[in-house]
Regions:
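Membrane-embedded transport module
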Residues: 1-122
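Alpha-helical transmembrane segments
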Residues: 112-116, 179-189
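Hydrophobic, well-ordered secondary-structure elements that form the walls
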Residues: 76, 112, 145, 154, ...
Length: 196
């Protein structure tokens, strides 16, 4: 979940682009991501075949490449999409604040997609995942409410250095989310085939 945040901080700095994520954005993202992950994954029911799985070896490291690879691939893919989206917006004449707003909104919603993509149970469709774990829908509603509140209230919007996206910005957010969902679904399908 943190890979896109790291990339969106480092890459603009290294390439001398306008800043995409300010400290206040990172604080808000941490306040959203950590509780969301804890609540959703802790409330997730155990997999149906959990007791049929062989136990993990005592010598197996939780930091083995096999365990980290999926998260790295997912996060780097989302980060690349957001960086390309930012570059496209800049080329289309969007202001740095407008580009930042689109990237921030898409990042927050992409984190929700990452949570959905990594659920252990009923991963074939969002509706099934929501029915198996009602906390996912609640987290989505709460996160969307926070985003709307930030964009609707000028003091919060100014604090976050964001702006309400125009038509081009909304289209960009929608396209980035669709591409992120395609990427995450593809990674999940490839991993399922490899593990089969």
């Amino acid at each position: 979940m943190h890979v896109p945040i790291i990339a969106l901080v480092l890459v603009p700095t290294l390439l001398a682009w306008p800043v995409l994520l300010l400290p206040v954005h990172i604080v808000l993202l941490e306040l959203l991501i950590d509780p969301a992950c804890a609540i959703v994954f802790e409330a997730d029911p155990p997999a149906a075949n959990l007791m049929a799985r062989p136990p993990r070896l005592r010598t197996a490291s939780p930091f083995a490449l096999n365990n980290l690879l999926q998260g790295l691939v997912q996060g780097l893919g989302v980060a690349l999409l957001l960086l390309l989206g930012n570059a496209w917006l800049a080329a289309a004449g969007a202001t740095p604040v407008a580009s930042r707003s689109v990237v921030f909104i898409a990042l927050v919603l992409s984190v929700l997609l990452l949570i959905w993509a990594n659920q252990r149970v009923l991963k074939s469709a969002p509706a099934q995942s929501t029915s198996s774990n009602p906390w996912l829908a609640r987290i989505v509603v709460a996160t969307a409410s926070v985003l709307i509140l930030i964009l609707a209230l000028p003091p919060l919007r100014q604090l976050m250095k964001l702006t309400v996206p125009d038509q081009l910005g909304l289209i960009a957010v929608a396209c980035l989310l669709v591409l992120a969902m395609i990427w995450l679904s593809s990674v999940r399908l490839v991993r399922a085939r490899v593990m089969a």
